UniProtKB/Swiss-Prot annotation:
Main location: cytoplasm
Entry similarity comment: Belongs to the class-II aminoacyl-tRNA synthetase family.
Keywords: Aminoacyl-tRNA synthetase, ATP-binding, Cytoplasm, Ligase, Nucleotide-binding, Protein biosynthesis
Pfam family, one: HGTP_anticodon
Gene (UniProt): hisS
Subunit composition and interactions: Homodimer.
Alphabetized InterPro entries for the sequence: aa-tRNA-synth_II, aa-tRNA-synth_II/BPL/LPL, Anticodon-bd, Anticodon-bd_dom_sf, His-tRNA-ligase, HisRS-like_core, HisRS/HisZ, HisRS_anticodon
Keyword Cytoplasm attributed: yes
Species of provenance: Vibrio parahaemolyticus serotype O3:K6 (strain RIMD 2210633)
Designated name of the protein: Histidine--tRNA ligase
Catalyzed reactions per annotation: tRNA(His) + L-histidine + ATP = L-histidyl-tRNA(His) + AMP + diphosphate + H(+)
Length: 422
């Protein structure tokens, strides 16, 4: 027997038993975002490697350790996208979407990072991202946070997530702070692990995000970034907090929140849950006002967020919020000469008469017992039975698979009866 081929480690199939919950999540996300007037954009999953090196940062873990990079047959270095913002910015610049007008966009799809697979973290994972270009006020920052808060309510998980905010200021604000932070870290060099020692010289703000408890202990005495913010950054963050207060959205200011990608400035935020065991981020974002110019476009303010769909699916499963629409409403059972085609015609009539109805025909033969067993297995609530007599009389037997009652109807009126049952 030939050796079976397995999926790549950390890249999972979404099976028929799982896809209804995914569809429910994706549809809810799309409906919430669309309610704010945002438009979908679809980008390739493969980009030039240089795009991510320039946008995300050479020294970030994503670029230095986690990207799937390869040379194509022309010798060009290409990368499976590890995140969506850089590709969205590239698309907007290339297609002149932000030269004269603001843009409010969203996208959804697979991303790739070569990480150690674990619960809620995979090598192929799915994100939904929302990006706004051309608006620089705290009002649009607040709208994005309000959008995510609405999504949590729609999904029923709003009591299981909490919001953390920070302002990391402008590039100029951070320059003096970096100097002060590095000086502090050098005084505690013996406590730092190798990762933080490296970050101290490449991106010292990332040390604030360490999970090492020994280093976390000394960071309580570290210089505070808020004390180095300029007046514009302070006013922007105060305006955001005021808008969130007015909207009734609770939050915590976490001065160690910096996010893991180099392009952020001013506002950064994360939605965090403890429902998955260890504390985990389900959504994060912030401002990246310099990224468009950095990638060759005109200076353009921008803000956005991304959410991990696998983690949201895990939350829904953990919290037992998995009610989804059944995949089959009506199962058509047939037996006898000429009944198969009659059953297929009736199914087509029902699909036209009842918007969204899901009708499955039985194929493969078998007696009524076998066919009803299959109807139960696929979760149908109604079975339609067609024998030779029913075909001759243009009737059909409708059986309620929940209550057990059955009755014979003219085929012309059965759609109305089914619509009342499902």
């Amino acid at each position: 027997m030939a050796k079976t081929i397995q999926a790549i480690r950390g890249m999972n199939d979404c099976l028929p038993t799982q896809s209804p919950l995914w569809q429910k999540l994706e549809n809810t996300v799309k409906n919430v975002i669309s309610a704010y007037g945002y438009n979908e954009v679809r980008m390739p999953i493969v980009e030039e490697t240089n795009l991510f090196s320039r946008a995300v940062g050479e020294e970030t873990d994503v670029v230095s350790k986690e990207m799937y990079t390869f040379d194509d047959r022309n010798g060009d270095s290409l990368t499976l996208r590890p995140e969506g913002t850089a590709g969205c910015v590239r698309s907007c610049i290339q297609n002149s979407l932000i030269n004269r007008d603001e843009q409010r966009l969203w996208y959804m799809g697979p991303m790739f990072r070569h990480e150690r697979p674990q619960k809620g973290r995979y090598r192929q994972f799915h994100q939904c991202g929302v990006e706004v270009f051309g608006l620089n006020g705290p009002d649009v920052d607040a709208e994005l946070i309000m959008m995510t808060a609405r999504l949590w309510r729609e999904l029923g998980i709003d009591k299981h997530v909490r919001l953390e905010l920070n302002s990391i200021g402008s590039q100029e604000d951070r320059a003096d702070y970096r100097t002060a932070l590095v000086a502090f870290l050098e005084q505690h060099i013996d406590v730092l692990d190798e990762d933080c020692k490296r970050r101290m010289h490449t991106n010292p703000l990332r040390v604030l995000d360490t999970k090492n408890p020994d280093i976390q202990a000394i960071l309580g005495d570290a210089p505070r970034l808020s004390e180095y913010l300029g007046e514009e950054s302070k006013a922007h963050f105060a305006g955001l907090c005021e808008l969130l207060d007015a909207a009734g959205i609770e939050y915590t200011v976490n001065e160690r929140l910096v996010r893991g990608l180099d392009y952020y400035n001013r506002t950064v935020f994360e939605w965090i849950t403890e429902s998955l065991g260890a504390q985990g981020t389900v959504c994060g974002g912030g401002r990246y006002d310099g990224l468009v110019e950095q990638l060759g476009g005109k200076p353009t303010p921008a803000v956005g967020f991304a959410m991990g769909l696998e983690r949201l699916v895990l939350m829904l499963e953990t919290l037992e919020l998995t009610d989804v629409r059944r995949s089959v409403d009506v199962y058509v059972v047939t037996a006898g000469e000429g009944t198969m085609m009659a059953g297929m015609k009736l199914a087509e009539q029902l699909r036209e008469a009842i918007s969204g109805v899901r009708v499955m025909n039985h194929f493969g033969g078998g007696n009524f017992k076998k066919q009803f067993k299959r109807a139960d297995k696929v979760g149908a609530v109604v079975a339609l039975v067609l024998g030779e007599n029913e075909v001759a009389d243009n009737t059909v037997v409708l059986k309620d698979l929940v209550g057990g009652e059955q009755e014979t109807y003219n085929q012309a009126e059965v759609a109305e009866k089914i619509a009342a049952l499902i």
